């Protein structure tokens, strides 16, 4: 199968529409998250990066498969990337706590909390979507070496923070990446126990699986 190299707004809205119909908790991140905050598309996007309630992820994967998507990177329960001729989706399961916060499993004992208060509304082609706040989208990029598209997005986030597109963005030299992208994904052997639990869990049981592993 030939996979798309970009993910257009129409495909993003199709996926967000499915999530909305399921009344599930989600959060758009990455470049599409930034453009949703800006209110217009400012560049092409390779994928849709999205946090999703872990209990809905199996149904989402099944639905995406029905539309021709197939896994290209499967690190569940941490993340799964799927691709098709329509686009690419990078799904990050998160356990939703009673207060609305989402908790995502990382490698080894790492867990990441995505606060409910860090979600806000943006728009893609005029359609409302749930995205991370500008501050949160900036925080989510702190652990990576910035690529050219990241520099573009960070500039937009700086201008949003400063209240207008005419403001000068923060210098790239002041942002110190914590880890390279590859360094963030070196401990793949530690997925074995989590993957076994994840695969054994029935539909709707993935959240319990993550909690069992200390989330």
Predicted regions and their residues:
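Short, intrinsically disordered C-terminal tails of secreted or membrane-associated proteins
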Residues: 211-213
């Amino acid at each position: 199968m030939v996979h798309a190299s970009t993910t257009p707004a129409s495909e993003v809205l199709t996926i967000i529409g499915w999530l909305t119909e399921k009344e599930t908790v989600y959060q758009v991140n990455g470049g599409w998250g930034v453009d949703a905050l800006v209110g217009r598309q400012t560049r092409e996007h390779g994928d849709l990066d999205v946090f999703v309630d872990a209990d809905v992820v199996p149904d989402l994967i099944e639905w995406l498969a029905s539309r021709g998507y197939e896994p290209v990177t499967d690190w569940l329960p941490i993340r799964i990337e799927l691709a098709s001729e329509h686009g690419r989706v990078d799904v990050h399961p998160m356990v939703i706590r009673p207060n609305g916060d989402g908790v995502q499993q990382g490698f080894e004992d790492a867990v990441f909390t995505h606060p409910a208060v860090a979600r806000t509304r943006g728009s893609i082609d005029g359609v409302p979507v749930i995205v991370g706040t500008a501050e949160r989208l900036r925080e989510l990029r702190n652990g990576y070496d910035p690529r050219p598209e990241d520099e573009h997005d960070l500039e937009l986030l700086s201008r949003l923070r400063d209240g207008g597109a005419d403001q000068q963005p923060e210098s790239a030299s002041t942002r110190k990446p914590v880890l390279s992208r590859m360094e963030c994904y070196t401990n793949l052997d530690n997925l074995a126990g989590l993957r076994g639990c994840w695969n054994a869990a029935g539909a709707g049981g993935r959240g319990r699986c993550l909690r069992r592993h200390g989330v």
